[in-house]
Each structure stands twice: as structure tokens, then as C-alpha cells.
Amino acid sequence: MRQSVSSLNPPNGEVYWREPSVSGGSPGFSAVSTPVIQGDRLLISGLMFQLDQAQPAAKILWPDTPSGTRRILSDTSTPLFKDDFVYSPRSGGLFVCLDAATGRELWQTNTVTALRRGACVHLTPNGTSLFLFTDQGDLVRAELTPTGYRELERVHLLEPTSPLFENKFAWSAPAFANRNIFVRNDRE
């Protein structure tokens, strides 16, 4: 999503609509988070769209910033869209809850992962709580609600090994199967 978000006609590739966007802060950096849809709302990186249900069209709900500016929530983490709220780390590591309709920040915490460029948290719903796998190799079980973040448990699973600037990261998403978690870094 380095230059734009586009809606295409699948059979012929015709562009229905396009919204210019800048997701990368530097050459070689782009947002890689997966788009998230709930009902008629589509969240791509830091852009929340209201999709038109009658025709292939959309309008931006938030943020209220000019086209072509850096509009991003997280470079690497896919947000969780739950009810009328969005839960996600920001690119610098702060973890936030946003009102899905307005983008207004309801709360933030700096306790999930380190505050640094390249911060990443993978979110996996698990009943009434969530598993959060951090770029530091920690698995966290937490409750996320519009009123706040509550950490229930934390365990360190593996060392981060992927270098970026002076820091090391564990960016790979975890996999869950048969009550097991599978995680990896560059060495194991």
C-alpha cells in the first residue's frame, strides 16, 4: 500500500475508486498489515473506509488528513476489529483502542511491547481474552475492552533475532493448533 488503496472490478481490472496513500516512511518500508473488514467498514493500515453497499464506492471515515500524507496505524501488525472498536499497536509500539466510527483514541498503553520503530504485535482472539505475540518474543494473554487493557499472563517464548537499526525483532506471526503454539525466529 505504498502509493494508493484501489478497488478493482475482478473480471477486467477496471478501477472503481482509488485513494492516494503513503504508508512507508522511508524507501523500502511499507505497511504489510492485512486489511480488516467488518460490515460496511474496511480498515487498511491507517485508513478507515465506509463502503457503499449499493455501488462500488467508498468514503474515508478517518483519519482527517490530506491525501498523500502518511496515514498509518501500524506498519506490521494487523488490527483487531471487535464490535465498534479497533485494537492495535501503533508503529512506535503504543497499544491503542480506537472508536471505529471516528478513529478517536479511547486509551493507550505502553506495557505490551517496547516503544520503538518496527514494533509489532500479533493478535489472536481466544474466548473472552486474546493472545498477543510481541516482537520481543513474548506471548501475552490479555483482555481488551473499550475501557482498557488488562494483562492476565505473560511468558517469554523465544529471542528476537531479526535486525532493524540497533534493535532485534521477532516479527513472524504465531500459529495455533491443538492447544499448541508454534513460533519462530531467524534461528529456530
Can you describe what each PLM-predicted range is?
Residues 1-188:
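Noncatalytic, solvent-exposed loop/strand surfaces
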